[in-house]
């Protein structure tokens, strides 16, 4: 995992998004994302999710259900849409925390999964930059 740009909270705190995250997580989301750098098969699997989200061309072996997060406009500023996939996250595989992989329609993170949860994942897992994290789709 790695630190992001520190800007996710601006988007995550928006009430329009938070209301939609309740449908994904069962509750509102922590106002931030956990960034997971992806390599090898994990990157291929993530690209499959991007295909399911309609962001890349190709075929996907993934069977996860995409959940659409609608964008909106507020005070002349556009907030883009995203696609979420329900998942669980763990640091060692013993304890799992409900989460979702969030793939914004517009992102620079094409090799990094952005994970949302009702928990502050850095403390709940706990984890820090460089730690290996396990995510499984549900």
Task: List the model feature ranges, each with a label.
Residues 117-123:
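Short alpha-helix capping/helix-loop boundary micro-motifs
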Residues 1-116, 129, 133-135:
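Long, compositionally biased stretches
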Residues 124-128:
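A short glycine-leucine-enriched loop at secondary-structure breakpoints
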């Amino acid at each position: 995992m790695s630190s992001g740009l520190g800007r996710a909270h601006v988007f995550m705190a928006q009430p329009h998004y938070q209301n939609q995250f309740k449908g994904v997580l069962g509750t509102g989301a922590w106002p931030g994302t956990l960034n997971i750098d992806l390599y090898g098969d994990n990157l291929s699997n993530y690209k499959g999710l991007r295909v399911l989200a309609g962001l890349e061309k190709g075929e996907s072996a993934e069977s996860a259900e995409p959940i659409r997060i609608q964008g909106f406009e507020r005070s002349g500023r556009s907030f883009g849409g995203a696609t979420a996939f329900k998942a669980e996250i763990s640091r060692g595989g013993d304890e799992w925390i409900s989460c979702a992989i969030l793939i914004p329609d517009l992102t620079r993170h094409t090799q990094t999964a952005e994970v949302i949860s009702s928990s502050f994942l850095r403390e709940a897992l706990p984890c820090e930059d460089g730690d290996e994290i396990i995510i499984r789709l549900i």
